Curated annotation (Swiss-Prot):
InterPro entries: FliT. Dual-function protein that regulates the transcription of class 2 flagellar operons and that also acts as an export chaperone for the filament-capping protein FliD. As a transcriptional regulator, acts as an anti-FlhDC factor; it directly binds FlhC, thus inhibiting the binding of the FlhC/FlhD complex to class 2 promoters, resulting in decreased expression of class 2 flagellar operons. As a chaperone, effects FliD transition to the membrane by preventing its premature polymerization, and by directing it to the export apparatus. Belongs to the FliT family. GO terms for biological process: bacterial-type flagellum organization; negative regulation of bacterial-type flagellum assembly; protein folding. This is Flagellar protein FliT. Residues 1-50 are annotated as: Required for homodimerization. The lineage of its organism: Bacteria, Pseudomonadati, Pseudomonadota, Gammaproteobacteria, Enterobacterales. Residues 59-97 are annotated as: FliD binding. The keyword Cytoplasm applies. Coiled coil: none annotated. It comes from Citrobacter koseri (strain ATCC BAA-895 / CDC 4225-83 / SGSC4696). It comes from the Bacteria.
Amino acid sequence: MTNFIPSLTDWHALHALSITMLDLAHSGKWDELIEQEMNYVQLVEGIARNPISPGNTFLINQAKEILNAVLRNEAELKTLLQHRMEELRQLIDQTGKQQSVSTTYGNLAGNILFPSNLNQ
C-alpha cells in the first residue's frame, strides 16, 4: 500500500522551495538559485512517484491550491530569469564591442597620425 501523506508533505516542501527560489532571484543570487534547481526537480519527481489517492478529495484540493501557488511562483521566476538573460545578453554584446575597440586601437599602436594626413 502506498503512503499518501508524504506526497502532501512533498507538495508543501515544493511550495516552500519555490518561494526560496523566487527570493533568491529577487536578491540576484543566481548561482544559489541554480543550486536549488536540482532539489526542486527531485521534489517534483517525488511527487510524481507518490500520487495522492484519487479518493481523497480533501488532499487533492489542498494539492491543487499548492500547485496553483507553485505555478504562480514559477511564472514570476520565469519572468525574472528572462530579465536576467537580457542583462547577460547586453553584457556579452558590450564585452564584444569593447574587445573590438581594443583590437582596433591595438592595431594602431605605434602609428602616429598627423593632422596633415587628414587633409589628403
